[in-house]
Amino acid sequence: MEAFWESRTGHWAGGPAPGQFYRVPSTPSCLMDPMSAPARPITRTQNPMVTGTSVLGVKFDCGVVIAADMLGSYGSLARFRNISRIMRVNDSTMLGASGDYADFQYLKQVLGQMVIDEELFGDGHSYSPRAIHSWLTRAMYSRRSKMNPLWNTKVIGGYAGGESFLGYVDMLGVAYEAPSLATGYGAYLAQPLLREVLEKQPVLSQTEARELVERCMRVLYYRDARSYNRFQVATVTEKGVEIEGPLSAQTNWDIAHMISGFE
């Protein structure tokens, strides 16, 4: 009677029926003994959810400028419109990241703890921009080799020892330095504009670098469907790191009705 009542109330849904034998399903051996489970790589980050698009970086005569918009895209949906993709690492280094935002948040936590651990020594030394860049190349390549990469492309800017530094690291650990950098769609749209100016004038002032980056952010807003007209600009000089924003560029859509063929 109790079994009948429990079956009617759903307590034994999928369990034994009254008056019949119940065959207990077998448990996979890998659940009983974890050591017998086949060794497979952990792949938690193979499907990025919330992503960010381009990050731009330019050297100038006494520092570096980095810019990134504040949009987090959920697929093609402009879901989060007020997230920061630029972080201050220490007084001489800053970092911008495109790609999976969750992986960027994880990296922020790791780098933040590294800086705290270094400051605890109290010896007056801190990580240089080049040291942070070098560590990131090893960290990204290590994760890639474990088939569980951090799905980001990073731009590291800094100023130390009277020298400006601008470096690039992608999710595979590929790294290089350059006077101008762009990730994501900006590598196709903004980088040619940056190089065009730097070829004519290799050394920019801070004002010129700032205006160039803002111009490129405006072009990306016009042309990149995953960009947004709300961005941050970070500058590092011998005085330290300064992050400004959110900012918006002045736009003009008067010729929009003349563009056809992209419907």
From Swiss-Prot:
GO terms assigned for molecular function: lipopolysaccharide binding
Domain of life: Eukaryota
Swiss-Prot/TrEMBL induction comment: Up-regulated in cardiac hypertrophy and hypoxemia.
Keywords, in A-Z order: Acetylation, Cytoplasm, Nucleus, Phosphoprotein, Proteasome
PROSITE patterns (UniProt xref): PROTEASOME_BETA_1, PROTEASOME_BETA_2
GO CC aspect terms: ciliary basal body; cytoplasm; cytosol; nucleus; proteasome complex; proteasome core complex; proteasome core complex, beta-subunit complex
N-acetylmethionine PTM positions: M1
Propiece span(s): 1-44
Main location: cytoplasm
Pfam family, any one: Proteasome
Modified residues (Phosphotyrosine): Y101
Modification sites for Phosphoserine: S26
One GO term of the biological process aspect: negative regulation of inflammatory response to antigenic stimulus
Keyword hit for DNA repair: no
Subcellular location(s) of the protein: Cytoplasm; Nucleus
Task of the protein: Non-catalytic component of the 20S core proteasome complex involved in the proteolytic degradation of most intracellular proteins. This complex plays numerous essential roles within the cell by associating with different regulatory particles. Associated with two 19S regulatory particles, forms the 26S proteasome and thus participates in the ATP-dependent degradation of ubiquitinated proteins.
Quaternary structure and partners: The 26S proteasome consists of a 20S proteasome core and two 19S regulatory subunits. The 20S proteasome core is a barrel-shaped complex made of 28 subunits that are arranged in four stacked rings. The two outer rings are each formed by seven alpha subunits, and the two inner rings are formed by seven beta subunits. The proteolytic activity is exerted by three beta-subunits PSMB5, PSMB6 and PSMB7. Forms a ternary complex with SMAD1 and OAZ1 before PSMB4 is incorporated into the 20S proteasome. Interacts with PRPF19.
Similarity comment: family membership: Belongs to the peptidase T1B family.
Name this polypeptide is given: Proteasome subunit beta type-4
